[in-house]
A protein has these predicted regions:
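N-terminal secretory signal peptides that target proteins for export/translocation
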Residues: 1-16
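Small-residue-rich helix-loop
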Residues: 79-81, 350, 360-519
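A short, well-structured edge-of-sheet supersecondary motif
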Residues: 58-82, 312
Length: 519
């Protein structure tokens, strides 16, 4: 049995006869009975500290590691700390650092440009002689998430731009150039068993629909027939070998998906009862640049724009002989992403790993040097930024931009200092607005219902197997503004889940009616 936790949505699927249960950072029901969250007002600082101490020293945490830091933005005083200098796995709390870096180095209004290059403009008849190259720079907003859930609109701006440039037919090839980023298509230390799932999608400067295909399974109308499968967006990029069966009512749902790494064939096994309401999943695609131009060709054809040649891609490993100096080419069309303020929010609220890594690379692409990967350059720039923010050296160690790597380490001290710094930053309001709001949206939409924390906690979640974290802002019952970092590692409890341990602490802060400089 292999189980893991990631921020996002709940998946339970069979894979090569193992069950992978992904219990996510949404507040979904747990196997154990839910713990009752605190409701009583806490009138004094002494009472708050007493309540917090009882919980952080609870015997159920004896084998775990818990780090806590709570500071008032209004007075600057530390209300409580426990193991605040200990390095712990942050999971997706790492995204706070990536989001802050992107806003600082690029600015809230920054947009990512995707360019269409050719040797010359199309002629009067709309014929583009030779190849058309789409040069990506990491725009991830070509996705249904940014278009009201409509997959058909994701590539529409790019197609419209080409049509507006007068392109009706292309005599050469359609080339997807993803060479803007230098390095492997995954974040450092992402593990192999993450790569077959949507949250481990390949990273590319040409990204379309989060580099995944959404899958919907329903039982067939006739017993014994294969389960029906539909995909969004519609595509032939993935080949599905369907070996599933529709079984009698009341049977057990047992579906297995397997796509060998770097291959585009997906094997489907198992069964679905005839009375099953259906099941959804998502499968990451291999070779995202190839996926991009494949889908673009289809979108162009629907607009009546034809391509006579083949589909090709170009990456950072291209030889000197095949590299292109685009300054000598004509940019016949381009699109720009949504502003960075929106990109950061769409990364933070649903806790999107691909977006986080792409934002780190976006920063790194502007500073990377020969012999250095774009990721290495981005991480180096992050360390410079953290030094400027007053974060002590050695207290924030990230290996990639999302927190999916278990090699990422942070201290509660570092995260609280980052939050305090961002409150003084020109992009303070943008950064704060990117955080999930308890009981309202993102990965906190279903958490803290009926408690004082609802709508008063704005925080980034983090969840991996045996790891739970929450870091952000809370407004107390006395309207004092606090920032906090709660990090729980190596916790295996089942009676009370790790998420519930963290939530109890956050609700105590929301219930605090005293003052940080009071008794």
């Amino acid at each position: 049995m292999h189980s893991n936790q990631v921020d996002g949505r709940e998946l339970t699927l069979s894979f090569e006869r193992w069950t992978f249960s992904f219990l996510l950072c949404l507040a979904l029901p747990t196997c154990a009975a839910r713990a009752e969250l605190p409701t009583n007002a806490i009138p004094t600082l002494a009472a708050l500290r007493s309540n917090l101490t009882v919980r952080v020293e609870h015997p159920r945490l004896a084998a775990a590691q818990l780090g806590v830091k709570i500071v008032s933005l209004d007075t600057g005083k530390t209300l409580f700390e426990h193991n605040a200098g200990k390095l712990l796995k942050p999971a997706s709390n790492a995204k706070l650092y990536t989001g802050a870096l992107a806003l600082d180095r690029l600015g809230p209004q920054f947009r990512i440009r995707t360019s269409c290059y050719s040797a010359a403009k199309p002629d009067a008849d709309g014929t583009l002689a030779g190849d058309l190259t789409v040069f990506g720079r990491g725009d991830f907003s070509m996705a249904a998430r940014f278009n009201g859930g409509d997959h058909t609109k994701s590539l529409e701006p790019l197609v419209t731009a080409l049509a507006a440039a007068g392109v009706k037919r292309i005599t050469g090839d359609l080339i997807g150039d993803e060479s803007f980023f230098h390095g492997p298509p995954f974040g450092s230390a992402w593990t192999w068993d993450d790569l077959n799932y949507y949250y481990g999608a390949e990273v590319s400067a040409l990204t379309h629909e989060d580099n995944v295909v959404d899958l919907a399974f329903k039982p067939a109308a006739v017993l014994g027939q294969s389960v029906t499968l539909t995909t969004k967006p519609a595509t032939q990029f993935l080949e599905f070998i369907n070996r599933t069966t529709t079984v009698t009512n009341g049977g057990k749902r047992s579906l297995a998906l397997h796509r060998p790494l770097a291959q585009s064939t997906v094997f489907l096994h198992g069964s679905l009862p005839a009375d099953d309401k259906g099941w959804t999943d998502a499968m990451p695609v291999p070779r995202p640049a190839q996926w991009f131009v494949t889908q673009l060709r289809t979108a162009l054809a629907q607009r009546g724009i034809t391509i006579a040649g083949q589909l090709r891609t170009r990456d950072w490993l291209a030889s000197e002989a095949t590299r292109v100096d685009y300054s000598k080419w004509v940019e016949i069309a381009f699109t720009e992403s949504r502003p960075m303020s929106e990109l950061v929010a769409q990364m933070m609220k649903p806790s999107q790993n691909l977006y986080a890594q792409l934002l780190l690379l976006q920063v790194g692409a502007r500073t990377h040097k020969p012999g250095q990967t774009t990721e290495e350059a981005g991480l180096a720039e992050l360390q410079k930024f953290l030094a400027e923010a007053g974060v002590k050296r050695g207290t924030a160690l990230l290996e990639e931009g999302s927190g999916l790597s278990r090699g990422c380490l942070l201290t509660p001290d570092a995260s609280v200092q980052l939050l305090r710094h961002m409150e003084q930053h020109p992009a303070a309001a943008t950064f704060r607005a990117s955080l999930p709001i308890a009981g309202v949206d993102g990965t906190l939409k279903s958490r803290f219902a009926g408690t004082a924390a609802a709508r008063t906690v704005l925080a980034k979640t983090g969840s991996l197997r045996y790891v739970n974290s929450l870091c952000g802002h809370v407004t107390t019952a006395a309207k004092e503004r606090l920032v906090f970092s709660l990090m729980l590692n190596a916790y295996t409890g089942t009676t009370v889940s790790g998420r519930e341990v963290i939530d109890e602490l956050a609700v105590l802060l929301a219930n605090f009616s005293g003052k940080s400089d009071g008794p």
